[in-house]
Amino acid sequence: EEKIRLTIGTSKSPNNIYVYDMGSKELKKLTETLNPEINANDLVAAEVVRYPSFDGLEIPAINYKPLDASKRNKVPALVWVHGGPGGQSRTGYSSLIQYLVNHGYAILAVNNRGSSGYGKTFFKMDDLNHGDKDLKDCIWGKKWLQAQDYIDAENIGIIGGSYGGYMTMAAMTFTPDEFKVGVNIFGVTNWLRTLKS
């Protein structure tokens, strides 16, 4: 083999296909997957952050700050909860997150306890208590957002799909005063029916 085919993407760019020629050491881009109507300069880079939860456990998260957000121009925010429950939010490109950020919302994609990618102990920390400690991790993510000087601390919601949608509904049900709004994207709301299917 003289050539390697690979995909490369970032939080600001969907994956593209490249070919690397090992002889000439040339990297050639074969695709351009970003819609040409989207200005790449409008997209925001993901920033990995960590914050302490209610019990001191360090929670990893990915922060997306709108370009025009500042101390003088505070923006509303959403706590983003991934599916799973053993899924993981990563720094790769998300068209929905970029859309929300470009419409003025800061996003904190929380990797609450039970998320994959942080070892077996972290992964098993939400076993037998879904919607409890993992939800508290999301609430403490909200507290982290409130401490940022560019966030409108009174306007923070929660959003998620699949298990993240369940967490959204758990937040709205068990802690109704924590979040201003909840957006359930195809989340589980009937565990008995889900477990039977």
Question: What are these language model-derived features?
Answer:
Residues 2-197:
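Serine-hydrolase catalytic core recognition
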